[in-house]
Amino acid sequence: EIAQCLVGSEMCIRDSLLQYTIKKNRGKMKSAIKKIFVLTGCVLLLVTSMRAQRACLNLSETLWNITLDRSAVWQNDSLYVPPVNIHDLPVHIPTGGWNLLDTPDKIGVTLPATVEQHLWGWNGETFGVTGNYVGVSWFDTKINVPADWRNKRIVMNVASVRFRAEIFVNKKLVGYDLVNSTPFAVDVTPFILPGQENVIAFRITDPNGNFNWKDSQVYTWGEYRTNPSHGFGGITGKVELVATDKLYIGDVFIKNQPDPHSIEVEVTACNETKNPMKAQKMLLTVKEHKGEKVLYRKEYSVENLVVGENKQTFHIHLPVAKLWSTDSPHLYDLSVSVGTDNYTQRFGFRWFEVKDIHGDKQFFLNGKRIVLRTAISWSFWPDNGITPSDELARRQVESAKKLGLNMLNFHRTIGHSNVLDYADELGLLYFEEPGGNQYPINHFNDNNKQSKFYFAYRNEKLVRMIKRDRNHPSLVIYNLHNERGAWPQVQDYAQMRMAHSLDPTRILTYNSSNGENPENEANARFKLHLMPNDTTFYDYGWYDRHHAGGPGCYHDNLYWGKDNYHRFSDHKDEIIYWGEDGAIGTPPRLQLIRDEILQSGTTSGWEAMDYMKWYDAYDSFLKHNGFAKAFPTVDDLTRAMGNVAFYYQGRVIENIRISNTVDAYAVNGWESMKLENHSGIVDNYRYPKGDVEVMARYNQPLFLAVKMNRKVLNVGDTTIVDTCLLYTSDAAD
């Protein structure tokens, strides 16, 4: 709108200023005219600059309505995986007609949003998961589209939905997608009416889903097996409209290199005109993300852009660039301009790899050894259940940093962009799984409708996940399955090749598993992996083993002596990763959660009222049973119980650091929610369950470990005390 105003008013500005100057001071005409043309030049420069930016309308902040379509028939629908031809699909309008949306069940909603967030207990039931809604719902809004978007290419970018979305613009079907929790785009150019109000409606179908940690359960939708995922239905990500010309940047992939000061930039330019375009200029600029310092600026000549996609590769080496690390997370912006379009991608200079140091496989970040200390997150969240607000995403990363962890895992479920954004900004590594990537081994080769749908679906989900997340410097490892009991099949090798071709810069593993992982022999089920910039399949060199359960608290028998203790390993020629360890159940920070719910003013979310009742029960117990002296508040009690798990996890992390052979340790687990996963060391609101200092002291970069082989003694007993100086080389210099 500003650009349009300036373009339309340029002559008016010039004429008005001239007349004003003539009347005010004819004697200074020459100086005034110079100033006028300087101003006019600034206006033109501003207009040119603004034209070089793609235009966006954020639909997430507009107000949406939610309407439950209780009578809709969906149970035996035919399902379609991308790509789809929208003209070949059945059109499902609201049951009884579009006037159904005139009486919504909820109004004034912003995105992301789920039915479970705003209409939990729609059926009068709220206990456990009885308030969940399964079926069809409608999310609709209205948006005014600028008149100057005429003759533009207009795309709707959807960050994610669950499960299926049928998208309507002005009551016409324009889009269809069911690869849930992944981004997709819909070309709405023929359907949007620039200069007018447009009605946007999403028909969401939530057919099934889980409210627990498992991603191996079988869920069906009619005659199809569907990828297991959390059972929330809605628009689970942000939505925007973007307008560009017919020549635009479709994607930018910044490939980190073994020399961490170097990057390879892969630009996808899209030509949607009817003819090839000759001699185009492409400008690449690298600048500090926080600041204005430009490190690199170069214009390249692109001789021929054919109709469709055009990939261009550029190599940039910047010795002056500051490296991204967990202690110094320096970030940069790379901007690419072609034609009238400009695309900016944030990234960091860094390199993560495995090195063999005198026969010992170890992780290295930017040439320094790093021992990964992580926790597994099932990605349940307050309110909408499935997607974090920016505040919660930041709190997740900050809580991990306060506890001294240097990584977290998206475990059995795909990750979230805003969590990775804060991990990039604050310095936390990430390990990601697509979730639900399992299928019964005896049906792999059925080659029927069900198996074809499932494999096409799981591959598309993985493709979208990788393309969405591969520019985040925080993300270092992909894993395809969790506790997969089956050996990799032909389809699994093909999927791994495909994934590695999309992002050859990261470690990719087939499985993170429990069971008897053989230590000194090759084994594809447990150990199959691909290394950065290496297309060789390795079935030895990666030793990942789960010990999910915990002992309840720390025991004397967890340390007997310097070579005999819990999670000791001297197995050096493979990466040693204890992939799940030590589940100890503790309650959430009920008092902090209650205060946050009361401050928000709403208890409509899928678990808010349960936490309120939970707090009241604890508070009543303390006050009426004589425990208030020991625990004056509910938070005093829950925090003390949380410290039991913190102490255990801290001492075991101390053990693996003493070994100096173990390369990674994953706490089981990260967050708890109302139903289970009580072993989480933070609650669903991402509050640490205990005093962070209890666990953080064992994650310090430099500290003296004091280990006793007996801490519980009778009078006259003796104990042996070992001391070990621990230093973490990934600490800041």
Predicted regions and their residues:
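Accessory beta-strand-rich segments of carbohydrate-active enzymes
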Residues: 69-70, 129-248, 272, 429-431
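Substrate-binding/catalytic cleft of secreted carbohydrate-active enzymes
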Residues: 407-671, 676-684
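Extended carbohydrate-recognition surfaces in non-catalytic/accessory domains of CAZymes
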Residues: 53-157, 215-228, 232-235, 245, ...
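Active-site-adjacent substrate/metal-binding segments within catalytic domains
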Residues: 117-144, 151-157, 162-168, 246-253, ...
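Beta-strand-rich binding/interaction modules
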Residues: 263-301, 720-729, 733
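Aromatic-rich peripheral "rim/lid" segments of glycoside hydrolase catalytic domains that contact
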Residues: 668-722
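Conserved small/polar residues in nucleotide/adenosyl-binding loops
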Residues: 1-2, 6-16, 727-733
